[in-house]
Amino acid sequence: MQDSKEKQCLIFVRNNANDTADRIEAYAKKSGMEVVETVFNTDKKAGERLRYYIERDVIICVLVRDVVDISMELNEIKAVMTLAAEHGISINAESRGYEPALISYE
């Protein structure tokens, strides 16, 4: 049986970023991924939703325009990226050509 999360991704974008969401969704579909949800970062619940998907291992990656779309706070970005890494989930940024974003522990 094929792993159900094999090609599933989550799109996480800033509030009112409909054009960005559409562009990233088109990239995901072109790359053969299934978008399980597009989350707009409008409030604290958006971050909770992001963590929900990561902690349940239902996706292989999170697609963002840039990692600062996750949060403007560096510690929050690092916490989310660390959680994702612990679950084998990459955070891929459009600004990096959809390469996985890397975290610095300095």
Regions inferred by a protein language model and the residue ranges of each:
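Short, structured surface patches at the beginning of a domain
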Residues: M1-E106
